Amino acid sequence: MDKIRNFCIIAHIDHGKSTLADRLLEFTNTIQVTEGQMLDDMDLEKERGITIKSHAIQMEYTYKGEKYILNLIDTPGHVDFSYEVSRSIAACEGALLIVDASQGVQAQTISNLYMAIEHDLEIIPIINKCDMASAMPEEVEDEIVELLGCKRDEIIRASGKTGMGVEEILAAVIERIPHPQGDESAPLQALIFDSVFNSFRGIIAYFKITNGVIRAGDKVKFFNTGKEYVADEIGVLKMEMVPRKELRTGDVGYIISGIKTSKEVKVGDTITHVARPCDKAIAGFEEVKPMVFAGVYPIEAEEFEDLRASLEKLQLNDASLTFQPESSLALGFGFRCGFLGLLHMEIVQERLDREFDMNVITTVPNVSYHIYDKQGNMTEVHNPGGMPDPTMIDHIEEPYIKASIITTTDYIGPIMTLCLGKRGELLKQEYISGNRVELFYNMPLGEIVIDFYDRLKSISKGYASFDYHPDGFRPSKLVKLDILLNGESVDALSTLTHFDNAYDMGRRMCEKLKELIPRQQFEIAIQAAIGAKIIARETIKAVRKDVTAKCYGGDISRKRKLLEKQKKGKKRMKQIGNVEVPQKAFLAVLKLD
């Protein structure tokens, strides 16, 4: 056990953790030199250059004549996946903190770092990409020293591209990170930190043993669900899975026991023996709560069941996705899905498209609201269509977040303007180093879900980074904004918005829809309404044929007769005609600027 080291890598998006991980794997001869990131195995992860799922891999390394086992648990860096990070961190004793030499400390670096410090991990700071021309290792060292309070000589300079500093990192992992603690003779206690779905073997759970021993064929049970299984196969994770007869305290491995549904494997759950269970679960397990909700509808109504099957399969290795059936007048049957955030939502959409070939329409994303009626009863609403009658409502509460934005001093003005427009209130600002500031805001989550992140990046030329934590619910003056096409409400376009922004938003939505809905044979009125009050209107004129073309010279009354006839026809058409709203329109409404 004292020859095992479990560690993870903490970094902001794009600071090069997956590349550096590749170098560590090559150096310890775990893999041959290959193309691209080994640990990001989804196509989507490689394309976007982000890590979505946590991964684990075991390396063997001989140091000063002794053989050590190093378990690297890779973590995602994006704010949407912070629960994945927290579970990976809980399975480790140490962490490599990677900071980009040209970008310095970013918001997510800090939030994941605090998580690691809460779990008492040994932190090894590394400055990556030191071979770049734009690298500023001295300034970044100052920031790290100020952040961690460590000594300068504890910071390792490295480069994932050239492989510089890799040997020092491995030496530091062995010397500075403590070996796992635990008692082999105690009852089995193991933490699940990830699960993947394999269509032949069912669900494979990855775990780390904190106490006890597990052998193949043991009867085990999962603590929080209380279900029992037989451990058909256990083993360790190298580039592929290597079966073993037994795993002992401190080991990181996998278990296959023919589990078919993801709901039974909850990440953060504890595995123990049926015959000799441990007293209590490992602390820190929490159900992941989705933050952003959107309707997902199949384009063809008969694909509803296929969509359900696809979502269930996605849920197998993405436990944070939730969904329940709902129906909409405009779009038919579909699902109301809960996501961790906007990136997560985009990824789920892309995976539906790529892995299951499903074409879907997604509605405007929104958050969950607490609605109190006059009697003081609370209902939770994820969907503007579920809003009760406005006369019954006493007040509405919406979720708030505490946001931290790190930026250079040049962009403070525009960023503050953006946050004010999103109803944010500045709590405080702190200077991290000479020209970098951290701004703390309280903001409604609903204002952020649509385009906040994109706009923050474009205002600050990509220099601002953003991170947030939920901060409870607060009362707010919200109204339901409906969009009517020819007097019929399109429920998929309804949104809940703050009263102060409603007029502006209604006007912009009408203008946007006017551009996107194709002209029909009859005229279309696009209206935005709050309750019964119309607040904005645009009209799409009808396409019409020149019916008087065949009258040469001729009498005006003859022409008038033909025009009247055409007008009647158009009127009749308008009564029975329905308006096709293209998918583009649903998406464009999300990104109003």
Curated annotation (Swiss-Prot):
Pfam families reported for this sequence: EFG_C, GTP_EFTU, GTP_EFTU_D2, LepA_C
A GO term, aspect molecular function: GTP binding
Domain of life from the UniProt record: Bacteria
Topological category with respect to the lipid bilayer: Peripheral membrane protein
Localisation: Cell inner membrane
Chain ranges of the tr-type G domain: 2-181
Enzyme Commission code(s) on record: 3.6.5.n1
GO annotation, cellular component aspect: plasma membrane
Binding site for GTP: D14, H15, G16, K17, S18, T19, N128, K129, C130, D131
Biological processes per GO annotation: positive regulation of translation
Primary localization: membrane
Reaction(s) this enzyme catalyzes, per UniProt: GTP + H2O = GDP + phosphate + H(+)
Keywords: Cell inner membrane, Cell membrane, GTP-binding, Hydrolase, Membrane, Nucleotide-binding, Protein biosynthesis
HAMAP family reported in the protein's UniProt record: LepA
Family: Belongs to the TRAFAC class translation factor GTPase superfamily. Classic translation factor GTPase family. LepA subfamily.
Biological role stated in the UniProt entry: Required for accurate and efficient protein synthesis under certain stress conditions. May act as a fidelity factor of the translation reaction, by catalyzing a one-codon backward translocation of tRNAs on improperly translocated ribosomes. Back-translocation proceeds from a post-translocation (POST) complex to a pre-translocation (PRE) complex, thus giving elongation factor G a second chance to translocate the tRNAs correctly. Binds to ribosomes in a GTP-dependent manner.
Annotated protein name in UniProt: Elongation factor 4
